[in-house]
Amino acid sequence: MKNIRNFSIIAHIDHGKSTLSDRFIQVCNGLSEREMKEQVLDSMDIERERGITIKAQSVTLDYTARDGQTYQLNFIDTPGHVDFSYEVSRSLAACEGALLVVDAAQGVEAQTVANCYTAIEQNLEVIPILNKIDLPSAEPDRVAQEIEEIIGIDATGATTCSAKIGIGVEDVLETIVAKVPAPEGDVNAKLQALIIDSWFDNYLGVVSLVRVKNGTIKKGEKFKVMSTGVAYQVDRLGVFTPKMKDLDHLKAGEVGFIVAGIKDIHGAPVGDTLTHAHNPTDKPVPGFKKVQPQVYAGMFTISSDNYPDFREALEKLSLNDASLFFEPEVSQALGFGFRCGFLGMLHMEIIQERLEREYNLDLITSAPTVVYKAIKKDGEIIEVDNLSKLPEPGAIAEIQEPIVRANILVPKDYVGSVITICIEKRGVQVDLNYVGNQVSITYDLPMIEVVSDFFDTLKSVTKGYGSLDYELIRYEPANMVCLDVLINGDKVDALASIVHKDQAKYKGRELVERLKELIPRQMFEVAIQAAIGGTIVARSTVKALRKNVLAKCYGGDVSRKKKLLEKQKEGKKRMKNIGSVEIPQEAFLSVLKKIKL
């Protein structure tokens, strides 16, 4: 066990984490040259295209160090984006050390700081590594000082490398061997294995990635999942090199996979503990905190025939992504679907994209919303993650909205424009510190403003240099109202949203004007209205198409023409009463994409 090293890499998007892991695999001969490709561990197409890591992956490599000994390095890859922080905490729970990889040209970013604190809280040894030192703009000394000032860990003598051209990679591996502590645990104790990740394989059933804390698990043995108490037999176990490599056993300190023919998707929940069926341990491994969804949206299939496939796809995804929440929902406008909970907007986009790509579904997503608290006059508190749960306006004493504390790191040239967008988003400044060339700005902002388009706006005003990390801190009363959309007097539930009263008229007008462009003209007039309660705040009309009923009258008496026109008018009136307006799917999609709450 003394030669095992479990570690993960903490790094911001684009700081070279995936490239560095490729180099580790190359140096340790994990794959042949022919099998090597860039970003080996980013196995999803979306990960490659967007250049981000979404899922945690693991690799076991044998490294012969300069002292002549062979070490088993278990490297657990982690995502860098703020929406996937849950994946990060899962990966860190299985490690003893973490490499803090920082781009020597760009410096420290906000999400790196947040993930680094998570690692420190879990008592991991954090080792700073300065990457991309081959760039002409690299300033390793300045960045090392930034690490010390912002994060507070000693970065003097930090290992430098360039993963892209392969300089210093062996030095990094030597640093891991020297500084990451060996795992603690007893090979002969009762089995305790923590499930770090699970995914569904069509041939093997559920595949679980586990970190064995104590004891040994062998092929053919029976184990049970502690939360459910169900026992299974091990069919295959082994490690990823990054290909699957079968072994006879996994012992304390090791990280590997277990296949036990589990067909039930919820058979091995992430964060659970496995133990022997015949000689179980009493207490599970302390897992990681259950994450609460922050953003909710309705998801519907365009054709209702795909509903069963949609449910199955969501179940398979939720096995692989423990932070996804869903429950059935019915919308009058969009039919049957699911109300889904996500960690943030990027998480929502990725889930939608994965459902569409991996499961060939066509989906519509309703406007995202956060969880509000409605306090009724009788004192009852209702958590509103869906507008249908909002009580009647007369019964509500106040609505409270979630407030997040956002920590923003930007170069000092952009401070003014960042403060401007924070004020526009109803933010309250808490703190502002200058650290070297960077400025750390802390604001309390309404969560709905942050999850809609704050990140994109921040990136554009800071030319891509701004970074953001946020966490929910409290609820506070706010003047929120429910904005309904009526078409010919009928409410369209899919387009309703909760907005701040000051912005309601502007949002209502914008929504109505956009719908006017998208709803095709009918044979009768279509009135589009935005309303708060019983008050109409905006209105627009799609004019009726008109058939020329006088075309067959050549000259002749004017009363004949009047009679035909009156008849047409009557017909239109009757049509308006009984005619229903078909709203095309494109109109929904276009409006929902643009609703920036």
UniProtKB/Swiss-Prot annotation:
Annotated signal peptide: none
Xref: InterPro entries: EF-4, EFG_III/V, EFG_V-like, EFTu-like_2, G_TR_CS, LepA_C_sf, LepA_CTD, LepA_IV
Keyword tags: Cell inner membrane, Cell membrane, GTP-binding, Hydrolase, Membrane, Nucleotide-binding, Protein biosynthesis
Enzyme class: hydrolase
Domain tr-type G, residue spans: 2-184
Keyword Transit peptide: no
Catalytic activities: GTP + H2O = GDP + phosphate + H(+)
Pfam families associated with the record: EFG_C, GTP_EFTU, GTP_EFTU_D2, LepA_C
Subcellular location(s) per record: Cell inner membrane
An individual GO BP term: positive regulation of translation
Role, per record: Required for accurate and efficient protein synthesis under certain stress conditions. May act as a fidelity factor of the translation reaction, by catalyzing a one-codon backward translocation of tRNAs on improperly translocated ribosomes. Back-translocation proceeds from a post-translocation (POST) complex to a pre-translocation (PRE) complex, thus giving elongation factor G a second chance to translocate the tRNAs correctly. Binds to ribosomes in a GTP-dependent manner.
Record-linked PANTHER family: TRANSLATION FACTOR GUF1 HOMOLOG, CHLOROPLASTIC (PTHR43512:SF4), TRANSLATION FACTOR GUF1-RELATED (PTHR43512)
Family: Belongs to the TRAFAC class translation factor GTPase superfamily. Classic translation factor GTPase family. LepA subfamily.
Protein name per UniProt: Elongation factor 4
Taxonomic source organism: Francisella tularensis subsp. mediasiatica (strain FSC147)
